[in-house]
Regions:
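Short, solvent-exposed loop/turn segments at the edges of extracellular beta-sandwich modules
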Residues: 88, 179-184
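Bacterial N-terminal signal peptides
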Residues: 8-18
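Active-site-proximal helices and loops of the catalytic beta/alpha 8
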Residues: 27, 319, 387-389, 393-398, ...
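Substrate-binding/active-site clefts of carbohydrate-active enzymes
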Residues: 202, 216-395, 412-426, 432-437, ...
Length: 699
């Protein structure tokens, strides 16, 4: 999220179900008189305001040069409202926060208590400036907030100024708390920021590594749970948070060029098993998407302290950590469902007769034991947002992947993004929100795919998600071009280019070739087999590929992925070519290097070299994609940044040459050679060239 919002904020307490509040920031309150200010800009004859504070009373706004204002004295709370512009009811265009009152969607204002002080903050030229905003009484602060002891206090400006160059490199998160001299407690204020090299990071710089925690590293066997009786491949296997920490500290992710970790949900999940979608096999909740507790780390993954230690280790290594947050559903044993069944839809089962996935996307249940959250219920939507804020704050996380976005009301994404922006982006540190809006690819025509793009775009914007998984690109090219070879590199180039011009400007999309929801790319690329989509042991599952061609295909795919725009996703194990069929067989336990064969070790060496190159190259991270040459089996494109240009050559055919380079260009990856203007390109190869990298010798 990129825009700092200034909407009124609420310190919420919901009486129907006790809510653990996390205050939002930046209220539009006039602390001179404690009023809440509503404003609208534009040309109109009349502008009025109506709201939940008194639906029977309409307030007329006062106009001044096209700007309309009204001030109301409202008690602390949360209120639906709308403007009435020349008789038409409209949302507040300056306030993205929404909610339902009497089943009608409205803008929502969150009003704080004006007697309580607030803080404002900015980071400028390495100086952190904290401004104290007194409550309506004007009382001054009683002391200095923890974390600002070394800051300089200016009583006239009511600011503390902290020189951040005196702090250690890395991430710092200040939680500012204070009382005023009258004893009024200020609303706490969170200030996350990075010092040193990492302060220059943008999310376009990411190489995201997805970890299914239970299937990664078993770092502590004492927290392993007992078998649940699930089908083979669908039970807990012992991976845990300590295992992730060990891998961070080993330097493994640094070797890969990985600077972001996305881990599956941390919440305590259901005990026992549930029936899989096939109606036959029992599966457990090892994956994390069947939560039963809102704010508890699953003991089979570790403890809260171990999660904090893992995040600290990641930050020390320059790695950001994203949580996976489930907004669409819970397991039927969840505390909220047991205590507040009215928070959930009583819908049909998605995909069954008369229950189309699209038509009933907002109210159908994925399974009978997964109640569907009704985001139209204010108490439910506010609580799920509060829980998300709690996880991000309690464990100092850096962003989130939002599960099943298109299956919840639009306000889920906008409200969550707004509150995260208010709470965490107080000095411009960007918290990345990545969505999952599962779509497909509908054929070669751009027109035929417009619905796919539009649906994904629906949830992206300044007041919503920062980006999403690029489902259209995945379905257009990964099997069509790489694993099956039915389409050529003209096709690859075309759909790569469409990902640059079909999404919301500024979106940071996540291209991928493998994930926890699809069969492993190595098995899909294993020519001559037909078991890549099998799931269960009795069906016959894919084995370890035994030909060089499979690993060459995986390298072609990852060579493309790691050198195109966006924040590419590396699914755990793909770096060495882990094999497997459909879920759950695509979630094998991670194998360390002692269990790789020479082909797997070679693939890891190449992918880690590409990851390192991407990490070090401003052009590969932030450059603009442009086609240089395309033929059925050879694609050459540039990634251009004002500081650097990198050229990438993907060749899935025989050895060839190309005359379009310069003797000052330098091969950064691959075995190609440049002589004068001609480059010799090996068969089945990936090449990365830095243009004008060789400085001519002095005369």
């Amino acid at each position: 999220m990129r825009k700092q919002l200034t909407i009124a904020a609420l310190f919420v307490t919901v009486l129907m179900s006790p809510m653990i509040p996390v205050s939002a920031d930046n209220p539009e309150i006039d602390y001179g008189n404690g009023s809440t200010v509503f404003s609208w800009s534009g040309t109109a004859n009349t502008v009025e305001l109506i709201g939940e504070w008194n639906w029977s009373e309409v307030t007329t706004l006062t106009e001044n040069s096209g700007n309309w204002f009204a001030e109301l004295n409202l008690d602390e709370g949360i209120y639906c409202y709308k403007f009435i512009v020349d008789g038409a009811y409209i949302f507040d265009p300056n306030n993205p926060y929404r909610g339902f009152c009497d089943d009608i969607e409205n803008s929502v204002v969150r009003v704080k208590n004006s007697s309580r002080p607030n803080f404002a903050s900015e980071l400028s030229n390495d100086n952190l400036i904290i401004t104290y905003l007194p409550g309506i009484s004007g009382a001054m602060p009683d002391g200095t907030p923890i974390g600002l002891e070394s800051a300089t206090w200016d009583s006239t400006a009511m600011t503390w100024t902290l020189d951040t160059t005196t702090l250690a490199d890395g991430k710092h998160t200040l939680k500012l708390e204070i009382n005023d001299s009258d004893g009024n407690q200020a609303y706490d204020h969170l200030v996350p920021f990075w010092v040193g090299e990492q302060s220059e990071f943008t999310w376009e710089d990411s190489l995201i590594y997805m970890i299914m925690t239970d299937r990664f590293i078993n770092g502590n066997t004492s927290n392993d749970g007992p078998p649940t009786g699930a089908a083979a491949g669908a039970d807990w296997m012992g991976g845990d948070i300590e295992g992730v920490t060990q891998k961070i500290e080993s330097g493994y992710f640094a070797d890969l060029g990985v600077n972001v970790l996305w881990l599956t949900p941390f919440n305590t999940n259901a005990q026992g098993t549930g029936i899989a979608a096939d109606g036959v096999h029992d599966v457990s909740a090892y994956h994390g998407y069947w939560p039963i507790e809102p704010r508890e780390v699953d003991p089979r993954l570790g403890t809260a302290d171990q999660l904090k230690e893992m995040v600290d280790a990641a930050h020390s290594a320059g790695i950001r950590v994203m949580m996976d947050y489930v907004v669409n559903h819970v397991h039927e044993d969840h505390t909220y469902y047991q205590e507040n069944p009215e928070w959930f839809n009583q819908g049909c089962i998605c995909g069954t007769e008369n229950c189309d996935w699209t038509e009933h996307r907002l109210d159908c249940q994925f399974t009978s034991y997964m109640p569907d959250v009704n985001w139209k219920v204010r108490e439910a939507s506010e609580q799920f947002i509060e829980d998300a804020l709690w996880w991000l704050e309690e464990f100092d996380l850096d962003g989130a992947r939002i599960d099943a976005v298109k299956h919840v009301d639009d306000l889920a994404a906008t409200n969550l993004a707004t509150r995260i922006n208010e709470r965490f982006e107080t000095v411009g540190t960007d918290y990345y929100l990545k969505g999952e809006t599962a779509m497909g690819w509908s054929g070669d025509s751009l027109e035929d795919n417009q619905f796919q793009y539009d649906t994904i775009n629906r949830y992206i914007g300044e007041d919503s998600l920062d980006g999403q998984a690029d489902f259209v690109l995945y379905h257009a090219v990964v099997d069509n071009v790489f694993t099956q070879g039915a389409r050529n590199y003209h096709h690859l180039d075309y759909w790569t280019s469409r990902s640059q011009d079909q999404y919301v400007p500024g979106a940071v999309m996540v291209p991928y070739v493998g994930s926890h929801d699809v069969p492993r790319i190595a098995s899909r690329a294993d020519v001559g087999t037909n078991d890549a989509y099998n799931q269960w042991q009795e069906q016959g599952l894919p084995g370890q590929p035994g030909t060089d061609g499979t690993y060459q295909t995986v390298l072609q795919a990852y060579g493309w992925l790691l050198t195109t725009p966006g924040a590419p996703l590396l699914y755990y194990g793909d770096e060495y070519g882990e094999y497997g069929g459909a879920d759950p067989d695509n979630r094998h336990m991670y194998r360390d290097s002692s269990n790789w064969n020479y082909r797997e070790a070679g693939l890891f060496e190449n992918i880690s070299a590409l990851g390192q190159l991407r990490l070090d190259s401003i052009a590969l991270k932030q450059g603009v994609y442009a086609t240089r040459y395309a033929s059925p089996d050879l694609l050459i494109y540039d990634m251009t940044h004002e500081q650097q240009t990198m050229s990438i050559i993907l060749n899935r055919g025989q050895a060839t040459t190309h005359d379009d380079f310069d003797s000052n260009d330098l091969v950064r990856f691959g075995d190609a050679t440049i002589s004068s203007s001609t480059i010799s390109i090996p068969a089945n190869s990936v090449t990365v060239i830095e243009q004008n990298a060789v400085t001519a010798p002095p005369p």
